[in-house]
Amino acid sequence: MISDMKIIAGRKKFSAIIIVMLISALLLQGCGLFKPTAASLTAKMLKELQKVNSAEVNTKIDSLIGVKVKSIDVGMEMNLGIDNKAEMTKDPERTKENNTLSVSGFGQNVNINYEQYTEKAEDGSKITYVRTEGTPWRKSTEQKQSSEDASGDGSADTGSADTGSGKKPSAFEMIGLLQKAGDTLKDAELKQELVEINGKQAYQINASVGGNLVKELISQSNAGSGKNSIDLESIDWDSISIPTELYIYKESSLPARIKMDCAQLGGEILGNVIADKTENTMLEGVDFEFKTFDVDITIDRYDEIGEIEIPAEALEAEEAGSVEELIPNLSNLF
């Protein structure tokens, strides 16, 4: 009996040793069982992203638009660009942004620089403060949408004019875009080689994002006003595919960068806006085409941002009645 027990104990020890050796061998050899995959990396990224309290978000949008006048068969090109550098905190919910909007083409080059703060008030409303070069601060208040309005009757009275502040996603929405993109990646492929982002090693995942993600983002961005400048239902979102490169920091598992080729999406949206806004105008006979539309978002300095203080003169600013009042020089771009 004792002999049998010794044999069983010996076998258990031997089995345990074999298991340890097997696991060690797998780890040392880099067996696929323990290698990160696109799915495992994005799943962990989404989990870690929920814990973030602050970050620095830099967004660049570069686009090239072809313009053709049908009546005289003349073609031209126009560059549109946005360079946004932002800091964000979750508690309190605030952002500080420096923006440059640029347009070049038709023999001219125009830039508009403006500073912007946003905060979520205690009543749930979103307040945006903006100052362009040489102008005083202006603010826009977007009231929180009531549950009745959220049901979709489109009758929301926001208490302020439609300034269009929701049309450019905030730094928080950029984070949300990363989160949603990571959750809806299609045909994801993890590259074998690590790359360097902001001096840190990162994984690269190539994939595509469906158009319905963008539809949801646009809807959420404009939810407070009860309006959309784009007829979302007239666009075939299912046919839109956005080639995407997602980079995830190796050490922290947090998103480092996302690059999106939005040329197809831009073409659909531009066509929608042009059809709605140019009927019976001088632009009715003009064709527009997005030749390139690249979005590049980089995130760094997670949980390193201190409290964002909104300047006193911004807090005391007058309410803007339109987007032209909020950003006075905007019309100079066109």
Place the predicted regions along the sequence by residue.
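Subset-of-secretome marker
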Residues: 32-334
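Bacterial N-terminal signal peptides that target proteins for export
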Residues: 3-18
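C-terminal motif of bacterial Sec signal peptides marking the signal peptidase cleavage site
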Residues: 28-30
